[in-house]
């Protein structure tokens, strides 16, 4: 167990909870180590926090909470890169963009989901090859 | 940066297994065909840049706004 300084404060992170993004994320290529943090107060929003830069955290959410129809294909190369052997052992989140001081305009990036192999501890933001989704789906459009 | 001129139907090799062929030139637009192994990632640059820009925006939240956002669950 190690203590990391993160945007959400100091966190005790077990080795098993460290997710390695071998190529970082677009715009944050230098950052490799992240962890997904669940805070009771913010659920269902969770947090993808950098363990290397305490200023970086992404609000994320399970896409199927928003829309049951969300689907995408993981390419062979990504399956290989993430060492996915068992489909049941992956987790998927999408990133929320919450405009500062204007949370009603929150959007969801369904075009580039975060895929994590819970077994290998490897993660990646996958860019989907589809026109079905964009980087900016209004969160309010998912409300019933 | 290597700059070279190609005509329609001509191609270049990058390494041993990537071939880039000029298929069609029409005004300001060039149609290119790329043959490459699956392991080679091919991405339109503006798409990568769009994700990059969105990620940079996504870290600019105000933690005080979160409660407002998570409310959507109580529907």
From Swiss-Prot, chain B:
The protein's UniProt keywords, in alphabetical order, are: Bacterial flagellum biogenesis, Cytoplasm, Repressor, RNA-binding, Translation regulation
Query: Which cysteines does the record link by disulfide bonds?
Result: none
GO terms for MF: mRNA 5'-UTR binding
Q: Name where it's found.
A: Cytoplasm
- What GO biological process term is on the record, naming one? negative regulation of translational initiation
Q: Which family does it belong to?
A: Belongs to the CsrA/RsmA family.
Judging by the UniProt lineage, the source's domain of life is: Bacteria
Q: What does this protein do?
A: A translational regulator that binds mRNA to regulate translation initiation and/or mRNA stability. Usually binds in the 5'-UTR at or near the Shine-Dalgarno sequence preventing ribosome-binding, thus repressing translation. Its main target seems to be the major flagellin gene, while its function is anatagonized by FliW.
GO terms for cellular component: cytosol
InterPro entries listed in its UniProt record: CsrA, CsrA_sf
**Subunit structure comment from the entry:** Homodimer; the beta-strands of each monomer intercalate to form a hydrophobic core, while the alpha-helices form wings that extend away from the core.
Q: Does the keyword Transferase apply?
A: no
- Name of this chain's protein: Translational regulator CsrA
Q: Which HAMAP family match?
A: CsrA
């Amino acid at each position: 167990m190690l203590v990391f300084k993160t945007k959400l404060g100091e966190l005790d992170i077990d080795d098993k909870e460290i997710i390695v993004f071998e190529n970082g994320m677009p715009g944050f290529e230098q950052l490799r180590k992240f962890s997904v943090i669940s805070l009771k107060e913010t659920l269902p929003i969770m947090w993808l926090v950098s363990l290397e830069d305490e200023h970086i955290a992404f609000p994320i959410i399970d896409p199927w909470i928003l829309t049951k129809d969300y689907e995408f294909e993981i390419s062979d190369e990504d399956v290989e890169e993430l060492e996915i052997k068992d489909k049941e052992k992956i987790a998927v989140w999408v990133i929320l963009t919450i405009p500062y001081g204007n949370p009603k305009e929150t959007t969801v990036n369904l075009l580039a989901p975060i895929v994590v192999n819970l077994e290998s501890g490897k993660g990646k933001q996958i860019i989907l090859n589809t026109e079905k989704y964009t980087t900016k789906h209004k969160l309010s459009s998912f409300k019933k | 940066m290597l700059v070279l001129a190609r005509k329609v139907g001509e191609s270049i090799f990058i390494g041993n297994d990537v071939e880039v062929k000029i298929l069609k030139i029409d005004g300001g637009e060039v149609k290119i065909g790329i043959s490459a192994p699956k392991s080679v990632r091919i991405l339109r640059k503006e798409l990568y840049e769009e994700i990059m820009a969105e990620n940079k925006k996504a870290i600019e939240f105000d933690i005080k706004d979160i409660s407002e956002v998570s409310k959507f669950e109580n529907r």
